[in-house]
Amino acid sequence: MSTSFASPAVAAPPRPAVGATRRTRVLIGTDTYPPDVNGAAYFTARLARGLAARGARVHVVCPSPEGAPYTAERGGVVEHRLRSVSSLVHDSVRLAVPLGVRGHLDRLLDRVRPDAVHIQNHFLVGRMLAAAAHARGVPVVATNHFMPENLFDYVHVPAPLRPHAARLAWWDLGAVLSRAEHVTTPTPAAARLLVDQGFTRPVEPVSCGIDLDRFSPLDGGAATRRRLRARLGVPDHRTVLFVGRLDEEKRVDELVRAVALTDGVQLVLAGHGAHRARLEELAAEVGAADRVVFLGFVPHADLPDVYRCADVWAIAGTAELQSIATLEAMASGLPVVAADAMALPHLVEEGGNGYLYPPGSPGALAARVESVVADEGRRLGMGARSRDMAELHRLEDSLERFERIYREASAGAGAGAGAGATRSGR
């Protein structure tokens, strides 16, 4: 284990033999990576491991979860962990210590010699890695997972200042992304959001993707579901499910209020977060304490069965740029009831695989959930349609597209360097 920024254990990649096909080399920079629990961290880990499984040489540079820097290989991915400190705004996120990071990134780029750098955030690691890559003529691909609204509750921005803070945050994001050779977001809605905020460069929607083998519908009937529920500690009742962080931005309180308005439907919440105690109090206040099940953190191996335990999926968030958890639910054959906000409508075919509801209306949410669970034929048909729609988001397709993006960016950078070309900004 390395204790310095230099990560001396990582040697420069060998040059391929004459006539051999060289493996793609990519250096992914991110300010959040497992064990962090959030969509960006989850996507980045799946991207890195998926690319490695397809034969790429993948390096990830990110903050250390322990504070001290180190280098390790996991799942075929070399992780370069930077010295970090607590973010103070959320107990699951640590920040890289700025001192010494640029020099470390310079040395890392010189050793790895990537075909492309792929940044997942515009914060410290992503920003500094992009600058270091540009200084060496290495092309930068950037994927945006950010909305200012997702940070406001953590950094406690007063409500009157939020519009001003949001404008500043969007400007700062655009300043970093504008220097990338290729910019992606998970959905067309997320791409339009960047354009609406004044970003003038092309933005390509590339789905986060879903592993359709890992997440699949229940293979068996009611008896199989009962056994799964018993194993996971879920009562055998009609179940609406949410998987994710129990934080304010996810608006889980809306789900609790909605289930209290239903006739005997239970809500299963899989995940942890700062608002769990508040949600437990709310469940008691609205008379649904016996119908809200808190599973807490669910081990990776058990997650597919958690989806198979449910009858319907519900999500109330209004700042989702895609929602990997909703894709997992769809791949698992669950109907979807989702807030009509941001990118969630892209995952709902009204009356086909589920329903949208007006955000902030627990009554409307409850009515749609009951409509699904009251008719088993409708529920099964909607679940089958969800699975069909999820197949449009195959993880392998997303990985293949990113591989092509890296090759295109690398070829373009080489041609530009040869012609002495310069890149324009925002």
Residues of each region from the PLM?
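Short alpha-helical donor nucleotide-sugar binding micro-motif in glycosyltransferases
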Residues: 109, 176-177, 297-298, 305-310
